[in-house]
From Swiss-Prot:
Subunit and partners: Heterotrimer of A, B and C subunits.
Job description of the protein: Allows the formation of correctly charged Asn-tRNA(Asn) or Gln-tRNA(Gln) through the transamidation of misacylated Asp-tRNA(Asn) or Glu-tRNA(Gln) in organisms which lack either or both of asparaginyl-tRNA or glutaminyl-tRNA synthetases. The reaction takes place in the presence of glutamine and ATP through an activated phospho-Asp-tRNA(Asn) or phospho-Glu-tRNA(Gln).
EC category: ligase
Catalytic activity field: L-glutamyl-tRNA(Gln) + L-glutamine + ATP + H2O = L-glutaminyl-tRNA(Gln) + L-glutamate + ADP + phosphate + H(+); L-aspartyl-tRNA(Asn) + L-glutamine + ATP + H2O = L-asparaginyl-tRNA(Asn) + L-glutamate + ADP + phosphate + 2 H(+)
Species for this entry: Rhodococcus jostii (strain RHA1)
GO molecular function (one): glutaminyl-tRNA synthase (glutamine-hydrolyzing) activity
Coiled-coil portions: none
Pfam families (alphabetical): GatC
Keywords: ATP-binding, Ligase, Nucleotide-binding, Protein biosynthesis
EC number in record: 6.3.5.-
Stated name of the protein: Aspartyl/glutamyl-tRNA(Asn/Gln) amidotransferase subunit C
InterPro entries: Asp/Glu-ADT_sf_sub_c (IPR036113), GatC (IPR003837)
Length: 99
């Protein structure tokens, strides 16, 4: 019995707002069933004796140090704005009332 049916693929497509043809539904059902079969094989691997680990590779942090540097003052940030009101940027309204 397949792990995922054509109807389940159609349901997922509707939830994702994807318009799929009948041929695509059949194709994706087969592909997803194959993927789920491979995942099932992985879940059957005996791993009870394997200790949990965060990362199998010894990776060190390669980011730069977090150093505080001076930023813009509110006045400097607002100085290039086309419109300012009460110390804030004024932008065009994009939502209607109550949204």
């Amino acid at each position: 019995m397949p792990a995922i049916s054509r109807d389940e693929v159609a349901h997922l497509a509707r939830l994702s707002r994807l318009a799929l043809t009948d041929a695509e539904l059949d194709e994706f059902a087969g592909q997803l069933d194959s993927i789920l079969s491979h995942v099932k094989v992985v879940t059957e691997v005996p791993a009870e004796d394997v200790p949990p680990m965060a990362n199998p590779n010894a990776v060190t942090n390669v980011t730069r140090p977090d150093v505080i540097v001076p930023g813009l003052t509110p006045e400097q940030a607002l100085s290039g704005a086309p419109a300012v009101e009460q110390g804030r940027f004024v932008v065009p309204q994009i939502l209607g009332e109550g949204e």
